[in-house]
Amino acid sequence: MLNIFSLICLNSALYPSSLFFAKLPEAYAFLNPIVDVMPVIPLFFFLLAFVWQAAVSFR
């Protein structure tokens, strides 16, 4: 267990930027704005569920 934990910590210390952010290849650089918004899209569906329930009076 300790070995796995230390391996994870070591890898995240060696490659800190690759954990959360990755650069797109140059051919897809024009898609950067879309890729930046993509993680937020599921939240829109979550909010849409509340709007829908409000529209039907939370039946």
Curated annotation (Swiss-Prot):
Organism in which the protein naturally occurs: Helianthus annuus (Common sunflower)
Cellular component terms per the entry's GO annotation: chloroplast thylakoid membrane; photosystem II reaction center
PANTHER family noted in UniProt: PHOTOSYSTEM II REACTION CENTER PROTEIN K (PTHR35325:SF1), PTHR35325
Subcellular compartments: Plastid, Chloroplast thylakoid membrane
UniProt subunit comment: PSII is composed of 1 copy each of membrane proteins PsbA, PsbB, PsbC, PsbD, PsbE, PsbF, PsbH, PsbI, PsbJ, PsbK, PsbL, PsbM, PsbT, PsbX, PsbY, PsbZ, Psb30/Ycf12, at least 3 peripheral proteins of the oxygen-evolving complex and a large number of cofactors. It forms dimeric complexes.
Cited NCBIfam families: PRK02553.1
Signal peptide range in chain numbering: none
Primary localisation category: plastid
BP-aspect Gene Ontology terms: photosynthesis
Protein name: Photosystem II reaction center protein K
Keyword terms of this UniProt record: Chloroplast, Membrane, Photosynthesis, Photosystem II, Plastid, Reaction center, Thylakoid, Transmembrane, Transmembrane helix
InterPro entries: PSII_PsbK (IPR003687), PSII_PsbK_sf (IPR037270)
Propiece span(s): 1-22
Pfam families linked to this entry: PsbK
